[in-house]
């Protein structure tokens, strides 16, 4: 039997097959690209509060599920599964890409929009219940639609990202600390299984041969990654927002530093603008601004329109700390001192800088009635049960009972206290490891 071959039909059939193949290839390619950049799945995230100390890797590893027959007390944890390694690499790649892209949301024209006299930077870890309260307070703040809010994260969380995705009342930018425990679960700056246990004496550590045996802190303890991370994040964030955030390249205003468990009064921006004007006109020697102290009077009468000039103290004025670019540049010149001082608290370390490295003691302009409150009565320094709803209810009650005194028409400096010498604070330790020192100092060199 003879078959007649029609060249035209063969050509058409070939083109059809090629077209189908191209469509299939393109679809798979897009899928692979989307999978590569997509956020990690919810079930890959650890339970909140799963922290660990020292070399107890299984409790701090993010995205790695503990196998049932693996003991958390093992001196050398099991080798991570390849899927876990791939997940960690996806986190790192995603963080790098987002920090590079710096996608600005809630602005009409991203290429032409510029921030005004205030930018907020919020340090976020993994307490969505408190972050939700902060966002609620921001939503109620008058004039917030003109304020850029930068959220700086050290933990990738779908729940937290969804909370921030719901912010539609102000410009928003998210950045991510690229050296978090989550991104380095099995190695420094996370907890390396070869690290020395926290309470191991130095002579025993030297015999054991753990990798940081030479570098205990001032109290003989070895580093705990979960405590070191906060100071790292704060210093990286300080540098990154001033030097690497493109929208702030020519910014001449102030940056107000917050944390996820802070709560702002509805008139905080109103008061802040008046404080900034007062500083320029009546207190040019003031180095920094603060939105308030931890002590709040039950009545705002006679004080809501008053501010004081004082010597800055880390235990009183670390909430709502606002810096100019000039103040930042003086701080960054003290990088070596900040990064080697043996205290895991960023604010106590700043206090040490004011007496050891900065040209003079910091002078702070602060309102007599706080416009910022600490909702987080639990956390790193507290062992209380977290009750964010109780705390927010108390703050709301205080504000509602004094709303007639808020939004003052003018602010006046009630008193300029004499700037007194402050003794160097007693260091708390937790920052003796030379690896922490060198990583901290490297942030200035990062592009």
Curated annotation (Swiss-Prot):
The reaction(s) this protein catalyses: an N(4)-{beta-D-GlcNAc-(1->2)-alpha-D-Man-(1->3)-[alpha-D-Man-(1->6)]-beta-D-Man-(1->4)-beta-D-GlcNAc-(1->4)-beta-D-GlcNAc}-L-asparaginyl-[protein] + UDP-N-acetyl-alpha-D-glucosamine = N(4)-{beta-D-GlcNAc-(1->2)-alpha-D-Man-(1->3)-[beta-D-GlcNAc-(1->2)-alpha-D-Man-(1->6)]-beta-D-Man-(1->4)-beta-D-GlcNAc-(1->4)-beta-D-GlcNAc}-L-asparaginyl-[protein] + UDP + H(+)
Oligomeric state and interaction partners are given as:
Homodimer.
Q: Per UniProt, where does Mn(2+) bind?
A: 261, 374
Q: Which UniProt keywords apply?
A: Congenital disorder of glycosylation, Disease variant, Disulfide bond, Glycoprotein, Glycosyltransferase, Golgi apparatus, Manganese, Membrane, Metal-binding, Signal-anchor, Transferase, Transmembrane, Transmembrane helix
Query: What disease is this chain connected with?
Result: Congenital disorder of glycosylation 2A: A multisystem disorder caused by a defect in glycoprotein biosynthesis and characterized by under-glycosylated serum glycoproteins. Congenital disorders of glycosylation result in a wide variety of clinical features, such as defects in the nervous system development, psychomotor retardation, dysmorphic features, hypotonia, coagulation disorders, and immunodeficiency. The broad spectrum of features reflects the critical role of N-glycoproteins during embryonic development, differentiation, and maintenance of cell functions.
Query: What does the sequence similarity comment in the record state about its family?
Result: Belongs to the glycosyltransferase 16 (GT16) protein family.
* GO biological processes: oligosaccharide biosynthetic process; protein N-linked glycosylation; protein N-linked glycosylation via asparagine; viral protein processing
* Major enzyme class: transferase
**Which pathway, metabolic or otherwise, does it act in?**
Protein modification; protein glycosylation
Compartment list: Golgi apparatus membrane
Regarding the membrane, this protein is recorded as: Single-pass type II membrane protein
Outcome of mutating residue 344 to A = Nearly abolishes catalytic activity and strongly decreases affinity for UDP-GlcNAc
Necessary cofactors: Mn(2+)
Q: Where are the transmembrane segments?
A: 10-29
Q: Which residues bind substrate?
A: 123-127, 154, 229-233, 298
Keyword Transmembrane in annotation: yes
Which E.C. number(s) belong to this protein? 2.4.1.143
Q: Kindly report every residue range on the membrane side named Lumenal.
A: 30-447
Q: Which GO terms describe its molecular function?
A: alpha-1,6-mannosylglycoprotein 2-beta-N-acetylglucosaminyltransferase activity; manganese ion binding; protein homodimerization activity
Q: What is the effect of changing residue 346 to A?
A: Loss of catalytic activity
Protein name in UniProt: Alpha-1,6-mannosyl-glycoprotein 2-beta-N-acetylglucosaminyltransferase
């Amino acid at each position: 039997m003879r078959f007649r071959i029609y060249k035209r039909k063969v050509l058409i059939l070939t083109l059809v097959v090629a077209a189908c193949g191209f469509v299939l290839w393109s679809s798979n390619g897009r899928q692979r690209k989307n999978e590569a950049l997509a956020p990690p799945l919810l079930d890959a995230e650890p339970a909140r509060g799963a922290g660990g100390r020292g070399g107890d890797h299984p409790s701090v590893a993010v995205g790695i599920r503990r196998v049932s027959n693996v003991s958390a007390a093992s001196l050398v944890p099991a080798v991570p599964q390849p899927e876990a390694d791939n997940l960690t690499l996806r986190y790192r790649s995603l963080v790098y890409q987002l920090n590079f892209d710096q996608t600005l949301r809630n602005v009409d024209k991203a290429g032409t929009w510029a921030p005004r006299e205030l930018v907020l930077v919020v340090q976020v870890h993994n307490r969505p219940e408190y972050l939700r309260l902060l966002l609620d307070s921001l939503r109620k703040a008058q004039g917030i639609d003109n304020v850029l809010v930068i959220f700086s994260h050290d933990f990738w969380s779908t729940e937290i990202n969804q909370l921030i995705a719901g912010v539609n009342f102000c410009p928003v930018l998210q950045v991510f600390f690229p050296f978090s425990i989550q991104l380095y679960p099995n190695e420094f700056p996370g907890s390396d299984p070869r690290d020395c246990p926290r309470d191991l004496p130095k002579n025993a550590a030297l015999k054991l041969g753990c990798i940081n045996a030479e570098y205990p802190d001032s109290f003989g303890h070895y580093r705990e990654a979960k405590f070191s991370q906060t100071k790292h994040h704060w210093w990286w964030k300080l540098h990154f927002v001033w030097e690497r955030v493109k929208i702030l390249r020519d910014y001449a205003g102030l940056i107000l530093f917050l944390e996820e468990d802070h709560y702002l009064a509805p008139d905080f921006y109103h008061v802040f603008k008046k404080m900034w004007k007062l500083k320029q006109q009546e207190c040019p020697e003031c180095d920094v601004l603060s939105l308030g102290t931890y002590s709040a009077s039950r009545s705002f009468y006679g004080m809501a329109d008053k501010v004081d000039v004082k010597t800055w103290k880390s235990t009183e004025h670390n909430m709502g700390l606002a810096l100019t670019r000039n103040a930042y540049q003086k701080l960054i010149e003290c990088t070596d001192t900040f990064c080697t001082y043996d205290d895991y608290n960023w604010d106590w370390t700043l206090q040490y800088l004011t007496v050891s490295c900065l040209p003079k003691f910091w002078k702070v302009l602060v309102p007599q009635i706080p416009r910022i409150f600490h909702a987080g009565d639990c956390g790193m320094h507290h062992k209380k049960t977290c009750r964010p709803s109780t705390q927010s209810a108390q703050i709301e009650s205080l504000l509602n009972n004094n709303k007639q005194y808020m939004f003052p028409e003018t602010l006046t400096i009630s008193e300029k206290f004499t700037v007194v010498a402050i003794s160097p604070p007693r260091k708390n330790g937790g920052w003796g490891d030379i690896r922490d020192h060198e990583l901290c100092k490297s942030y200035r060199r990062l592009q």
